[in-house]
Amino acid sequence: MTKIGGILVCLVIVGLDVAAAILGIQAEVAQNQVKHMRLWLFECREPSQDAFRLGLGAAAILVMAHVLLNLVGGCLCICSQDEFQRSSSTRQISMACLVLTWIVFAVGFGSIVIGTMSNSKSRSSCGFTHHHFLSIGGILCFLHALFCVAYYVSATAAKDEAK
């Protein structure tokens, strides 16, 4: 029963991350369909309400996936480098995956938020181009799914190993 629960948790997290990735990429497509004028590095364009909504949805779903992972993955506390070096390889892999998950989440979430905010109604302006933030955030959602599964599997194995 535990294996079925673990598989279900992984599928839900991957499903949420894939949904966030698809929404982020669709937001990029919607953003590119808006009229804009470009002169070298500067660009003037109208914000896309569709891109704003899709980006907001992608950010919310990515946060849900990350929170779910941290709730079900548990906490494997390693407080010092000595403790890290003395811990088992499974626990070290788990901690590395957790750190990578947080890094990918921070960069992906930040990219999606930057892309989403550039499509806010109040942001109809000219300036430096900010292309591909939404699609980069979407791609990082796929990477987030990969590290989430790796963390969950290794954290579960480390907990079983400790028993």
UniProtKB/Swiss-Prot annotation:
Could you tell me where this protein is found in the cell?
A: Endoplasmic reticulum membrane
Q: Does the keyword rRNA processing apply?
A: no
Q: Extract the InterPro entries matched here.
A: DEAL/Modifying_wall_lignin1/2, DESIGUAL
Single GO biological process annotation from the record: leaf vascular tissue pattern formation
Signal peptide (from-to): 1-27
One GO CC annotation, please?
endoplasmic reticulum membrane
Stated name of the protein:
Protein VASCULATURE COMPLEXITY AND CONNECTIVITY
Q: Which organism is it from?
A: Arabidopsis thaliana
